[in-house]
């Protein structure tokens, strides 16, 4: 089923501006409560000016530009401005530190970065490394440092024409984005996402929540994540709805913001639902216009029931990952929820449960969740410059191995059991155990290390490190956590540390993690 046709992202925005004109497309609220608002027509002009800005800086079709930004309208301008000229966005998780960010720049060969003043000192250090491909920074903010190779985004953009000046031939098969996501190896993989992927995501996710042009979709999810892009922004814009982007999540402010913008749809991760539930009950708890709340793993049935009862909303399950672009298994519009099922497979996809020999399993048996889609259209195209990793995850016929365990019932409803891959889910972020183990093992006092996820009432999982010290060494908790904080993003820092004399291993030498909690 081809629901996109040949319409690329440039055509999409030109059409949206023509159809919806002065209708509100984007509302942004900062942490300080400052609100910026754009109609479909004015947002398209901002996108065009940004595209012209990139062109003036030498960016052409196929070039890669990194964005290291918190939620802001400029992220939207850059995302689609790059797409309009056939360039490729490389969003960087705004919580990453220097070494992690530099690795992404190096491996995607980014020469231009758009970032804000708070992240600039980190990138000034990165640019001092002769091996970095980064040679220019476009800075969002009021004050511009007197450094070579730094431009002021706002000033440059304001001088550009609202009419696009560079219009190379575009195809829906062209790459629009490389989104680096954590994997089971020590380094992230770049998920290649096409124009078709993003257009399909808009239509598919709009169908999933029955989105209309009179809806208001509010999100606090970070714009550098696939969730914000493909289950919030793209469906909202594709349906002609109003997209409300908040800079940061605040449990105290959330429901006031829902009411302020008369949001009809939003999305939550379990951490948000749990923190909202611990807020004092108020007479206004049910005074809102929300009809759907998209949510993602993992919540207990009791937590779901308590949330829906208190706030009078429907929770709509959506299961997917960066590689699937959208929630390929989930609840459907109008369906009765079948907890604890994650729902049924969506249109344009197939799903199977397979055993370790890659054979389909019957209903009720646990195996790996595998999804069939069309690479570059309904699922990701490939891992950037990693053909072996692509071949391992993606079969030639389009079957994607998710690395997650689950089963299905006789009626075709799927149930998630556990993540097979070596990952920890922490407050909406995927954290690679191997990556943390490699970083921590560099400590001169540590001989052996393993990290595991343990249940956390607020953030899904907490991170615990089990370490074996070199003979005769001592290591305080303060020293350990200080080392971690200086070498990894804050959300990756373990919450707990335990020193052991050895680690349990099987006959092949692999650590038996189930014996460590």
Swiss-Prot record:
Catalysed reactions, semicolon-separated: 4-(trimethylamino)butanoate + ATP + CoA = 4-(trimethylamino)butanoyl-CoA + AMP + diphosphate; crotonobetaine + ATP + CoA = crotonobetainyl-CoA + AMP + diphosphate; (R)-carnitine + ATP + CoA = (R)-carnitinyl-CoA + AMP + diphosphate
PROSITE patterns, per the entry: AMP_BINDING (PS00455)
Keywords: Ligase
Keyword field contains Ligase: yes
Gene3D superfamilies: 3.30.300.30, N-terminal domain of ligase-like (3.40.50.12780)
Protein's pathway: Amine and polyamine metabolism; carnitine metabolism
GO MF annotation: an example: carnitine-CoA ligase activity
InterPro entries registered for this protein in UniProt: AMP-bd_C, AMP-bd_C_sf, AMP-binding_CS, AMP-dep_synth/lig_dom, ANL_N_sf, CaiC
Enzyme class: ligase
Pfam families: AMP-binding, AMP-binding_C
EC number: 6.2.1.48
SUPFAM superfamilies with a match to the protein in the record: Acetyl-CoA synthetase-like (SSF56801)
PANTHER family with a match to the protein in the record: ACYL-COA SYNTHETASE, MEDIUM-CHAIN ACYL-COA LIGASE ACSF2, MITOCHONDRIAL
Protein's job: Catalyzes the transfer of CoA to carnitine, generating the initial carnitinyl-CoA needed for the CaiB reaction cycle. Also has activity toward crotonobetaine and gamma-butyrobetaine.
UniProt record similarity statement: Belongs to the ATP-dependent AMP-binding enzyme family.
Protein name: Crotonobetaine/carnitine--CoA ligase
Annotated source species: Salmonella heidelberg (strain SL476)
Species classification: Bacteria, Pseudomonadati, Pseudomonadota, Gammaproteobacteria, Enterobacterales
